[in-house]
Amino acid sequence: MAIGYPNGKKYAASHEVLPQQKRKAPVTYGKRGMSLEDDLNDTIAYYLTHEIAVIHKKPTPVQIVSVDYPKRSSAKIKEAYFKTPSTTDYNGVYKGKYVDFEAKETQNTTSFPLSNFHDHQMTHMANVLKQDGIVFVIIAFQKLGETHFIPFEKFYPFWERMQSGGRKSVTIAEIQDVSDQIPYGLNPRLDFLQSIDKLYF
């Protein structure tokens, strides 16, 4: 059967082969776009809203180098650099105790590199521990979907081992041995206060 257009022309079928479309991988919606920092920020916001704990993320200090003043009433930063933070990322109060911790994540599946920490952070956490504060490290192995709560007094020996010429990383087995795994939830996302309750209260 011939097909005709309203203008009277005949339809000419094209015999060109269309390129085959590539199959897309299925989309996974779990934890999409979420980092450890996002999860912790959501968690501490939940704690604050529900008056469970007061914990805040400290802003990263910035060194401003150059500022442009296009108008008297406005300023535009032209050049700035992140300073190395002198303490940890998070601090606050829970059940009358000072809480201080550092959070790190890695894509590694077998170990955590200690180069993610700095001397001044270790010194700060050791000082908090001396004052009887609750101080710990949260480490997330993103590819494994595991997040670990490690009391500082159990984490610090790994740092000392590296300082004395030993391993520059902590194996996943070592971390699992000294940590409390934090399960992912909805609200709060990463309920690390469960670990504090279990280990300190």
Curated annotation (Swiss-Prot):
Protein's cellular compartments: Cytoplasm
Cellular component, GO annotation: cytoplasm
Single GO term (MF): endonuclease activity
Superkingdom assignment: Bacteria
SUPFAM superfamilies per UniProt: Restriction endonuclease-like
GO biological process: chromosome segregation; DNA recombination; DNA repair
Textual note on the cofactor: Binds 1 Mg(2+) ion per subunit.
Function: Endonuclease that resolves Holliday junction intermediates in genetic recombination. Cleaves mobile four-strand junctions by introducing symmetrical nicks in paired strands. Promotes annealing of linear ssDNA with homologous dsDNA. Required for DNA repair, homologous recombination and chromosome segregation.
Name of protein: Holliday junction resolvase RecU
Gene: recU
